[in-house]
């Protein structure tokens, strides 16, 4: 009898502790975990492309799981019925890139154009850049930037205008590789487009066209590690020089970068590529990890778009080889260079991109 009594007392203690722990867990869960930073957002139209009369535009903010508040432009189609579900909700697409650009450049153009075609879209500034929050400024990280895409999906999934089961993403240049990386990690992303993509971990590790050597990587690590010490000593971060005026014999793609980022065509004062520069030590993170490791496990749809004459074409084609399933597509744009797919609306295959999203976000 005494043994049985002790047994029931023990059960009561366990149950009480369990209830107490559940209450604590619920209290923690119900407490506010993130307080978004109040960002200083511009109100005027300061994009590198004209404003469309076919969409409504507004500024929004959201946060990632690291607590960083991101700034975005939302584009909402004014008159569309073909993409709405029975409840009137829209499919949505989050757009970012190129790597080192801001939402007022190519990503905004893509987002606005797709909104004209019936999709609710957002173009966002990555963590630590543009109008988004985060300190220090001008830092990139493969993990953090992959997370930025999923954070955009968090926001869209809870937006009253959006059908949470019909969300896609689109990454341009270095954000194309990050978009595929995000799709591998986040099954909520039902359709992914990578336009004129870079694999930033590959090019930082191996150099262009994989011509880098192990010794060169080691020497770069030595220099960047020294730079860390100097940055800490100085209390500031040394930045890279982005897209200086190229020499006459420079590769054509370097001339193309200069033409986009440093001239009226695509210059924006908040753009890292237009002049601010990355913190040099950002390279360390991209040299010590590789994205696309699980690209072959993506079950949802992926569409890779690249230019026939793009210096980066090999990165898109190699990424496509990693993908599996009949819902994966590769399209090579005849005659197009890497930067042609930033802003040349007569070259960017918007009809094909729209059809891809309609297939996997609208007609699913």
Regions found by a protein language model. Name each.
Residues 336-347:
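Catalytic histidine-centered segment of alpha/beta-hydrolase-like enzymes
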Residues 180-263:
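Alpha/beta-hydrolase-fold enzymes
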Residues 84-98:
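Short beta-strand element of the alpha/beta-hydrolase
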């Amino acid at each position: 009898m005494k043994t049985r009594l002790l047994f029931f007392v023990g059960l009561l203690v366990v149950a009480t502790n369990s209830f107490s722990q559940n209450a604590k867990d619920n209290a923690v869960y119900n407490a506010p975990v993130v307080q978004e930073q109040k960002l200083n957002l511009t109100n005027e139209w300061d994009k590198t492309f004209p404003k469309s009369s076919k969409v409504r535009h507004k500024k929004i903010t959201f946060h990632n799981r690291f607590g960083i508040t991101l700034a975005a432009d939302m584009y909402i189609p004014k008159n569309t019925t073909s993409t709405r579900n029975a409840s009137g909700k829209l499919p949505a697409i989050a757009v970012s890139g190129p790597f080192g650009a801001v939402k007022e450049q190519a990503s905004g153009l893509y987002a606005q154009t797709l909104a004209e075609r019936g999709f609710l879209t957002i173009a966002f500034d990555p963590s630590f850049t543009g109008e988004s929050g985060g300190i220090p400024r001008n830092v990139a990280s493969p993990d953090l930037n992959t997370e930025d895409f999923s954070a955009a999906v968090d926001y869209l999934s809870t937006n009253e205008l959006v059908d949470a089961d019909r969300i896609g993403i689109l990454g341009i240049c270095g954000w194309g590789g990050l978009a595929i990386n995000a799709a591998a990690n986040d099954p909520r992303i039902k359709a992914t487009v990578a336009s004129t993509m870079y694999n930033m971990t590959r090019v930082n590790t191996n150099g262009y066209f994989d011509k880098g050597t192990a010794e060169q990587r080691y020497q770069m690590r030595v220099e960047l590690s020294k730079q860390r010490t100097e940055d800490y000593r100085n209390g500031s971060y040394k930045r890279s020089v982005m897209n200086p005026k190229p020499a006459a014999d420079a590769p054509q793609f370097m001339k193309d970068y200069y033409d986009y980022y440093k001239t009226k065509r695509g210059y924006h004062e908040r753009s890292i590529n237009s002049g601010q520069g990355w913190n040099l030590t950002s390279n360390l993170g991209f040299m010590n990890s590789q994205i696309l490791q699980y690209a072959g496990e993506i079950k949802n749809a992926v569409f890779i778009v690249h230019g026939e004459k793009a210096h980066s074409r090999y990165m898109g084609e190699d990424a496509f080889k990693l993908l599996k399933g009949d819902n994966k597509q590769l399209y090579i744009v005849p005659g197009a260079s890497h930067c042609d797919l930033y802003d040349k609306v007569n070259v960017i295959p918007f009809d094909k991109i729209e059809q891809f999203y309609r297939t996997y976000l609208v007609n699913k």
